[in-house]
Amino acid sequence: MATKIRILPENLTNKIAAGEVVERPASVAKELVENALDAGSKEVVVEIESGGRRLIKVSDTGCGMSRDDALLALERHATSKIATDEDLFSLCTLGFRGEALPSVASVSRLTISTRTSDSVEGTEIYAEGGRIKEVKECGMAVGTVISVRNLFFNTPARLKFMKSAETEGGHVGELLTRLAISRPEVRFTYKNDGKVMFRALDADLKERVATMLGRSISSFLYPVSYQEGGLKVSGLVAAPECSRSAGSHLYTYINGRFIKDKVVQHAILQAYRNFLERGRYPVVAVFIDIAPGEVDVNVHPTKHEVRFREQGRVHDAIQKAVESVLKETPWLKRSAVAAASRPAEKGGGALRPFSSMEASQAALPVTPQPRPALTPGHPDPPPQAQLQQPLVSESRVAEVRELLVNFQPRPQPPLRPQYRGSVAPREGSPYAPIAAAPVPASEPQSAAQDSDHVAAGYFSSLGVIGQFNASYILCQRGTDLILIDQHAAHERVAFEKLKGQFAGREVDSQGLLFPETMEFSFRESAVLREHQAELARLGFEFEEFGGNTWLLKGVPQVLSATRYVDTIRDILEELGSLSRSRAFSDIQEDLLARIACHSVVRGKRTLSPVEIAALFKQMDETDFSSNCPHGRPVMQTLTLAEVEKMFKRI
C-alpha cells in the first residue's frame, strides 16, 4: 500500500520557508538591513525599483564576508550569530536564525558582492531560485552589496498579492524609519526609482526622530530616562497635541530591536491616559534595555512580538518612566516661556478671545503718536534709535496680519425683529435673564415668509428656552422638554453638506492665500503621494515640495477656520490602513464624517438666538437629523410626566 505521507522536495520547502520570512519587499529590506547592522555597518544605502518588485539593493560598510562564508550564508540555518541553544537566551544581534538569505534567494534572482578588510579582492555570487549559478572574484570596497531582482518571479500566486509600487515603497520607507530611529549613529539613505527619498546623517536621537518624523515635532519631544534594577527605559515622548488617530507612531524597542508588543504599548497608553482623548495615540520613541535572558524574542517569525520573564515589572517600569515626564507637563512650561518672551502690550490683562471684528479694527495707527515736548527737565531729544522703533511690536503685527488673512465674515440673515419684547426682571431678583426671552423659531421671521405661508419644520417649531453649559440647547414642544447637543447637530449638518458636494464631484475647497508648508513622516508622505487625487476630491490641494515636505494650497471650505493639520494627519492614518479588500469607496463616508467633526466647534460656545434659528433651519433641511455621523443622538426628550416623577409629584 502506497504511503500518503511524503517528503517534500527541497525547492518546495524553500518556498514554504520563504513565505514565512518574505511577505513583501519590505520584508526583504528588513532582513538585509538587519544583517548590515549586525555586521557593524556605519552607513546603509537602500535602493528599490518598481516598489521592490524589480530591484531591492542594500549596500553597507560592514565587515563583509570571505568567499567561503558567503557561500555558506546561502545555506539554510547557517549563521555566525549563535552556536548552542543557550545562545538563544543571550542574543545581542538582530538576526540569528540563518534563514534570511536562503529564503530571499529561493524566490528571486540574487547577487551578493562582498569583501573583508584582509582580502585584496571581493567575491560575487549569483543565485536564481535558490540555486547558485555563478561565483567569481570582483573588485569593491570593504562591505557587502546584495541585489534582489525579480522578487517572486517563480511564485506568481504571491506576486498577485503585491500592492502598487507606491504602497510597497511606502512600506519599505516605514521599515527604514523604524531602523533609522533605533540606530541614530548609522547613516541611512533610501532611494526609490532613482530618487532620494531621505538621507539621515549620524546624529543624536532627537535629531534623528525629527529627520524621520518631521521637523515640526522636534520642539514637542521630551527625554525619558529611568532605571530600576537591571531594567533601563530611555527615549523621547511627545506632547499630547502631537497625538495620532492610530498607533503608527509608537516606536518601541527592546535591546535595539523594534517590537509591537501589547504589554509595552499598554504601559505607554496607560501613562498617557489622563492626557489623551479616547482613540488617540501618542508619538514616542521608547527604548527598553534589559538582560537578554529576561526576554524571549524567538516567539514570532517577524520577531515583532516578545515574551518577558517578569511581564508586570517591565510594564510598571515603562509606565513610571513615561509618567515621570508627563506629570511635569513640560509642554505647558514651553508655552509659558514663549508667552513670556513676547513683549508686554498696553492694556494687557486676562486672556480673552480676539474676535473677527477686533481683528478688522486692529489696524496700525494712521497718525503718529505725539512726541513729548522738550522741557528744561528733558533738555535732550530722544535718541534716534528710539525714534525709529516701531509703534507696535513685530509679534503684534504678525498676529494681526494672520488674523486678517484668515478673517472670513460670517454670513448674517436679513435684519429683523428678534424679540417680541423684553420683560424687566423684578428688582432684586436673583434670576435676571441673560437676555430677553427670544421669540420661538416657529414665529414668522419676515413679511415675505408670511406671504409665502411656509410651514416650519420640526426643529424650527421648537420654542427655545436657552442654553445649558454652553453645549446644549434647551427647548420646549408642548409639554415636552427637549435637549439638543449643538455639536452633534452641527456635525450632522456639515456631514450632509460635504456628502452632497462629494457626490456631485468634489468637496468645495478654499484656497490658502499663503500655501502652508507641511512636513510628514515617510509613511504619511507615501500615503499622501498614493492618494493625492482622492484627497483633492475631499478638498485638500497638495503640491510636492521635495522629500517628505508638501505645500498645502487648499482645504475644504468647512475647515478653513479650524486647525486642519490634525484632520489631515488623521485622514492619512485612515488611508494608510487601506488594503486590497478595503478600498477608498469603503471609507469615504468615514473620512467625510471626520472632516465634519473637525469643522465644528468641539468645546463650549454660547450661541445667539440668530445662530440657533439658523442651525435649526439647517437641521430641518438635513436627512438623518436625529443622529450625528458617528451614531450619537442629537436630541433627547423628557416628558412632563418624567420631570414630575423626578420631583415626586406623581
Curated annotation (Swiss-Prot):
Residues 367-384 have a biased composition (Pro residues). GO terms for cellular component: mismatch repair complex. It comes from the Bacteria. The keyword tRNA-binding does not apply. It holds the Pfam family HATPase_c_3. The keyword Heme does not apply. GO terms for biological process: mismatch repair. SUPFAM superfamilies: ATPase domain of HSP90 chaperone/DNA topoisomerase II/histidine kinase, DNA mismatch repair protein MutL, Ribosomal protein S5 domain 2-like. One of its GO terms (molecular function) is ATP binding. Keywords: DNA damage, DNA repair. Residues 358-392, 408-448 are annotated as: Disordered. Residues 430-444 have a biased composition (Low complexity). InterPro entries: DNA_mismatch_repair_CS, DNA_mismatch_repair_MutL, DNA_mismatch_S5_2-like, HATPase_C_sf, MutL/Mlh/PMS, MutL/Mlh/Pms-like, MutL_C, MutL_C_dimsub. CDD domains: HATPase_MutL-MLH-PMS-like (cd16926), MutL_Trans (cd00782). Belongs to the DNA mismatch repair MutL/HexB family. NCBIfam families: mutl (TIGR00585). This is DNA mismatch repair protein MutL. It comes from Geobacter sp. (strain M21). The gene is mutL.
